[in-house]
């Protein structure tokens, strides 16, 4: 049930765009990819999900096969001796009471099926989280390349300004050298930013299975409307990994029952008919009988099997608690990032505006001798750093809010 709820949650998340507004105002925007679309494409083609779906189909077939164990088994045999005496036998047997083994095997198959279904949701969640990270990594690299290009243009402008002043003998030659050094440094940063964009673009394209021209992101998505405790409780309730481990625990309970069935006799109803019996007095003999078999195994093998099944069940319970702790940590980490960054966005925007205006102010003061050329270049560097910091905060905010929505 938990797995089904989680599956519905994933479909709802992908079908409703809570923060993306698509507007086809230009050819580039028409080809832009939103984060919701990226997750849809990744889920549709990712081999991890296809593998999980194959495991689910196999588990369903195994469940169907285990249910047939309740029905009669029909057999036929033919033998011919060295004396050319032929004998044909047809038989049928049906279990009456197997000490609980058949029910245990069916319960095990059910738990495997439920676990495989949860495995699909788990794979989907994993792919979605991976896609979110890659999507916003690409978005960040794209924005940082824009900032790097803007920084190059601004340093080029400053270099031309100081070059004219040096040519007019109103500034020393060292200012030109300093401006040129900063310009080359900006160009190097631009090359690095372009390389980072190409790397993140290739990773995202590999995940979504298509070529990406651009991404479309709304920097002001709808904030979360629940608290931390509710987020943690919801995340645990709908977690597909927790649901899968719970199914494994049920499977180990079935293994315990199956192991205990060896302590009881197995009763079955049989029918057998012989043809061409070598004994003339038993022509076409047929008989119906009740078979009782008791095979507890060698020594204390049954007790050891039961103990092993119980230990595996306890191990799964410990894994379940460990997974709950890990999920709490993930949600709390994403929540803390979401809340802390949300308070830093506005000050960072104000810092960008302030540092940008400082550059022109310093240029005017430099012209009248109140600021040095190094002060002007440092102001430009601080403005670039402020823009990069703002992008980092924006991406961290978007990543955390989308991660929380997927985890919940």
Where are these regions (language model features)?
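Periplasmic alpha-helical coiled-coil/stalk elements that build and connect Gram-negative outer-membrane
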Residues: 2-9, 33, 126-238, 248, ...
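Small/polar-residue-enriched beta-strand and adjacent coil segments characteristic
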Residues: 34, 72-123, 243-324
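Surface positions of alpha-helical coiled-coils, especially the charged/polar e/g heptad sites
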Residues: 34, 41, 48, 91, ...
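Amphipathic alpha-helical coiled-coil segments
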Residues: 51-66, 123, 127-150, 157-160, ...
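Residues at or immediately flanking beta-strands
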Residues: 73-75, 203, 214, 266-268, ...
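Outer-membrane beta-barrel domain signature
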Residues: 81, 85-87, 191, 273, ...
């Amino acid at each position: 049930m938990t797995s089904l709820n989680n599956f519905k949650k994933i479909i709802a998340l992908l079908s409703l765009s809570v923060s993306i507004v698509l507007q086809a105002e230009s050819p580039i925007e028409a080809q832009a990819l939103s984060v919701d679309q990226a997750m849809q494409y990744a889920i549709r083609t990712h081999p991890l999900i296809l593998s999980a779906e194959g495991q689910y189909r196999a588990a369903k077939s195994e469940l169907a096969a285990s249910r047939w164990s309740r029905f009669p088994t029909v057999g036929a045999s033919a033998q011919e001796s060295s004396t050319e005496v032929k004998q044909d036998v047809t038989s049928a047997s049906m279990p009456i009471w197997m000490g609980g083994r058949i029910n245990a095997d069916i319960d095990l198959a059910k738990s495997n099926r439920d676990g495989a279904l949860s495995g699909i949701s788990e794979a989907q969640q994993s792919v979605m989280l991976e896609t979110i990270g890659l999507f916003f990594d690409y978005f960040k690299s794209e924005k940082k390349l824009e900032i790097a290009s803007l920084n190059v243009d601004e340093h080029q402008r400053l270099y031309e300004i100081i070059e004219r002043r040096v040519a007019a003998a109103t500034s020393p030659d060292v200012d030109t050298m300093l401006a040129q050094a900063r310009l080359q440094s900006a160009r190097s940063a631009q090359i690095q930013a372009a390389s980072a964009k190409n790397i993140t673009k290739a990773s995202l394209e590999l995940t979504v299975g298509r070529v990406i021209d651009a991404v479309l992101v709304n920097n002001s998505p709808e904030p979360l409307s629940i608290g931390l405790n509710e987020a943690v409780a919801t995340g645990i309730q709908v977690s597909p990994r927790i649901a899968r481990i719970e199914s494994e625990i049920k499977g180990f309970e079935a293994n315990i029952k199956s192991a205990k069935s060896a302590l009881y006799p197995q009763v079955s109803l049989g029918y057998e008919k012989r043809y061409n019996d070598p004994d003339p007095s038993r022509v076409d003999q047929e008989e119906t009988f009740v078979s009782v078999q008791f095979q507890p195994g060698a020594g204390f093998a049954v007790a050891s099997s039961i103990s092993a099944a119980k230990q595996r069940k306890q191990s799964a319970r410990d894994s379940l608690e460990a997974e709950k702790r890990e999920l709490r940590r993930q949600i709390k980490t994403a929540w803390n990032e979401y809340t802390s960054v949300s308070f830093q966005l506005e000050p960072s925007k104000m810092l960008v505006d302030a540092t940008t205006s400082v550059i022109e102010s310093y240029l005017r003061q430099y012209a009248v001798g109140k600021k040095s050329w190094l002060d002007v270049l440092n102001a430009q560097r601080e403005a670039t750093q402020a823009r990069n910091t703002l992008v980092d905060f924006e991406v961290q905010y978007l990543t955390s809010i989308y991660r929380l929505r997927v985890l919940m």
